[in-house]
Amino acid sequence: MVEAKTGPLAGIRAVTCSTAQAGTVPYMLMADLGAEVIKIETPNGGDGSRKAGVLLGDDEAISSFFETNNRGVKSVTLNLKSEEGRAILYRLVETAEVFGQNFRPSAAARNGFDYETLKKIKPSLVYASVSGYGQLGPEAELPGTDAVGQALSGIAEAYAAPGQPMRTGVVSVADESCALLTFGGLLAALIHARNTGVGQKVETSLVGSAVRLMGWTLTTTMWRNRNPITGARINGTRERPGIAACFNDSNGKPLVFQLDSRHWKQAMDALGFWDRLEERGASDLGLALESDEMKDLILG
């Protein structure tokens, strides 16, 4: 006997044709909260990420990447290019509250699972579409990746040292932020559908989600008309000051700090800098020291 799932999303069924990380994590999170998630995979190997990451086992190797991003999800193989495969998909959609995919816009329509098609089958359906660059515009049909999202949003520049090329981080911040925003959008749309009987389409993108992570930096840039990286930096390095940083001291001991306005004044007082900073109009915690000339002006 199969045990009934529990959790706040118990009783919700989601069907997804999503792959990779940004496309699958929202539904993994739904499964964690009790939803039944059915993942549609292609014939001849299924989701390509089944062969990504570290593989354990011999004949039936298990992928660390796939397991990380598809935990608790059921899987079925369908050929959605065939009439029979699409007919089975449509029957599943009739029984589901949520459908998700991360295909390019034209591919979803070409394969018969775009929003306009599926909402005719179930008007209350909550439909999520994850893309690289959004549904409209010149890049809409281009494939997107986490690295591209980090680069176009400015995150890759923020990771780099001054004068060095852009550098993407080890953590898939564009993929994961997109997944979390998609998850939040799905929950909001589910509440709306429960209250009104009308479904909604949730659209997210890798670049748009990564730009959200740069929000405070970009807002401060507009207000101060400064470089978005050095002018509004939260996390500091030895070369680029910030209000938070992680270093190793001369003995290798990790040093971590983050300042708020009160601690900033106390620290500058203790170092004997506060009066000098006030005289030069540079006592604002958010001020970034952008050049040697600026440093000399304030601290010289």
Label the predicted regions.
Residues 44, 132-134, 206-211, 251-253, ...:
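Glycine-rich beta-alpha junction loops
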Residues 1-198, 222, 229-230, 285:
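N-terminal helix-loop segment corresponding to the beta1-alpha1 unit
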Residues 62, 141, 179, 183, ...:
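A structural signal for well-ordered alpha-helical scaffolds and beta->alpha junctions
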Residues 199-207:
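Beta-strand segments within the central parallel beta-sheet cores of soluble alpha/beta enzyme folds
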Residues 66, 229-239, 245-246:
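Short Gly/Pro-enriched turn/cap motifs at secondary-structure boundaries
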Residues 243-300:
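Aromatic-enriched alpha-helical interface/lid elements that frame and gate functional surfaces
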Residues 213-235:
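Active-site-adjacent elements of ketosynthase-type condensing enzymes
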